């Protein structure tokens, strides 16, 4: 289990990303299509004023059961340990253990 503080921090980041996503995209597009250097530098200053945790790159994929960040399977939203456990308990529809 991940620490509760870490999970809360991750939730806060997700909320910030959701809140500032449209504004960040608008600023990036205007920077991309700006014609003058001074306009570009002003827009970059505006972009820098946004919170650092509002960047999507700061998010970390976590298991929704345990909150573990490592060994994460995107298709299931689970860590490797929980995927194995839930697979053996037949809790994931369509998942079968390989045998050949």
From Swiss-Prot:
SUPFAM superfamilies: Glucocorticoid receptor-like (DNA-binding domain)
Primary location group: plastid
The keyword Chloroplast appears for this protein: yes
A UniProt-annotated Pfam family: Ribosomal_S14
Keyword Cytoplasm assigned: no
MF (Gene Ontology): rRNA binding; structural constituent of ribosome
Localization (cell): Plastid, Chloroplast
GO biological process, one term: translation
Keywords, comma-separated and alphabetical: Chloroplast, Plastid, Ribonucleoprotein, Ribosomal protein, RNA-binding, rRNA-binding
An annotated GO cellular component: small ribosomal subunit
Job of this protein: Binds 16S rRNA, required for the assembly of 30S particles.
Subunit relationships: Part of the 30S ribosomal subunit.
Database matches in HAMAP family: Ribosomal_uS14_1
Family in the record: Belongs to the universal ribosomal protein uS14 family.
Name this polypeptide is given: Small ribosomal subunit protein uS14c
Native source species: Bigelowiella natans (Pedinomonas minutissima)
Phylogenetic placement of the source organism: Eukaryota, Sar, Rhizaria, Cercozoa, Chlorarachniophyceae
């Amino acid at each position: 289990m991940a620490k509760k503080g870490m999970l809360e921090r991750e939730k806060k980041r997700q909320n910030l990303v959701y809140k500032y996503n449209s504004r960040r995209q608008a600023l990036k597009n205007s920077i991309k299509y700006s014609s003058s250097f001074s306009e570009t530098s002003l827009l970059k200053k505006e972009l820098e004023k946004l919170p650092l945790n509002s960047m999507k790159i700061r998010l970390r994929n976590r298991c929704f059961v345990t909150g573990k960040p490592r060994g994460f399977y995107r298709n299931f939203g689970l860590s490797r340990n929980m995927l194995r456990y839930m697979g053996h308990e037949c809790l994931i529809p369509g998942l079968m253990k390989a045998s050949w």
